[in-house]
Amino acid sequence: MPVVDIDTDELRGLTGRTDTSDEEFKEDLFGLGLEFEGETDEDLLQFEFAPDRLDRLSVEGVARSLRYHYGDDRGVYVPETNDPEWTIEVDESVPDERPYVTGAVIRGVDLDEGALDSLIQLQEKLHATMGRGRAKGAIGIHDLAMVKGAPLQEGSEPSITYRGVDPDGVSFVPLDANDELTPNEVLAEHDTGQTYADLVEGLDRYPAIYDELGLFSFPPVINGKRTEVTTGSRELFVELTGTDQWTIDRMCNIVCYALSARGATIEQVEVNYADGATAPSEYGAELVRPNFDTDEKSVSHDRIETLLGVDFEPEEIVDCFERAGLDASYTLDEDVTYEVEIPPYRVDVLHPLDLVDDVGRAYGFDNLEPRYPDVGTVGGRHERSRLEDAVRTSLVGLGFEDLLNFHMTSGTENYDRMNLEAGSDAFGGGNPVEITEPYSEEYTQLRTWAIPSLVMLLERNTHNAYPQDVAEVGFAAERDDSENTNVAERRHVAGAVARRDASYEAAKGRLQAVCDDFRAELETPRTEHPSFIDGRTAAVVIDGEVVGVIGEVHPAVLVEHDLEVPVAAFEFHLDALR
């Protein structure tokens, strides 16, 4: 869980609550979901919070939430932006592994030591969370006075360039250094370069940002010393690069909102992707950023009342939304429905339940009255839950390591890297349940089978000793028009054996032992499956019903996952053991 350091003197200044004590702040923030963790040596208060509210990674974001909580602010706030005076030109030489860029110009910012520390903390916390350790998105913040833009043509606005460079063909002075280094030398000799070297290693060209004077940023590794931000900086240039345009745009919004809270003016920049550059398909080749357009979600009145257990008037719910920093209107049809406007720094509102949570926090969870449900039964474990544990115990007894993998995946992992085609008749090849608005390209659908999850885990553990025998009892789903929900949800049992002598017989022996434990009759007639080797693949038939597949993983799949040892695997439906 993310932990943010808060200077309460800064918090008092940003909220206007100069008489509020530290203890009162702790209590108020607990009501917002931030739990006090302790104090630093510098007497800063540390708060832990759920990682969904990334806008609270700075004292400015926490202060904004408190101002809404106190009723000092209401509804959606969108900072005014000035028209672009700077352009970011994206060259076709940018490496495909990090193709996207965004940015903003900040003017009139007043950075004392506290504000600068907060900005650096926000930058690093966003790197660690939304930026996935800078792999998905990285932020560079520069003193604009030290950036010299070169107009592309006479009379045009100044521009900088995002391009790919030869790792040994250019040099610059990085932060915390005095001598010029090439990008490769930064990775080898600089402490920060060594920390993030794995993000660019293996690339033919490294990402770099240039102005008229030369390279001043080597994302996602380090900035140049020339544009270092200090307490004397009054105008800033913020640039973000990454693998997903949506992610870096939202990270940029959070940074801009934090600086706006300090009285800064936000100026947009133009982002132009050149012919041959990888432009974001959903936005086009010419962007204006930051984009402060609001989003909209809807939620029904009945859903809010049912989940919170409180009878509300529509006006009360609108009031709660406004005190949560949202705007809402409603329609009086058979069921009252609220159309809710969401500000651009709220990256956590993905589902109507997130809106219900906002209403609950604005109303005050302390004000909810607990009551026992009117149920005349005694609770107990479901039969399937007991079966799952029994199967896990059996697998562990056979030498498997029990796993719990993500149920979300992508088409690339579920199908492409497994040599499987979506919609095929092969086990695991069913049509997937896809996410309408995926938060990440890595999680766009529910998995249709579990073996890809096991193979991915083996891929991440090639540095560990063999044998590696892993298994999972987990969830899988696929589209099925015969179901009332159009989705068939099942629990699957999967196991994989990775070792020098892994074979069909080794996997079959483990599978037979599991079936024997549950007195199930196992048959394994020969079959074909694109993820497995022909002639070394069989269907799993339990008590006369085809419920899975077993075999030696195809060499093409092993190569795709950089596995240098054979792998044999099996998977079947859990309910077959009932």
UniProtKB/Swiss-Prot annotation:
EC number: 6.1.1.20
Family matches, as Pfam families: B5, tRNA_synthFbeta
Subcellular location: Cytoplasm
The UniProt record lists the keyword Ligase: yes
Cofactor(s) this protein cannot do without: Mg(2+)
GO cellular component, one term: phenylalanine-tRNA ligase complex
Ranges of residues in domain B5: 292-370
Residues holding Mg(2+): 348, 354, 357-358
Catalytic activity: tRNA(Phe) + L-phenylalanine + ATP = L-phenylalanyl-tRNA(Phe) + AMP + diphosphate + H(+)
Family assignment from sequence similarity: Belongs to the phenylalanyl-tRNA synthetase beta subunit family. Type 2 subfamily.
Protein name: Phenylalanine--tRNA ligase beta subunit
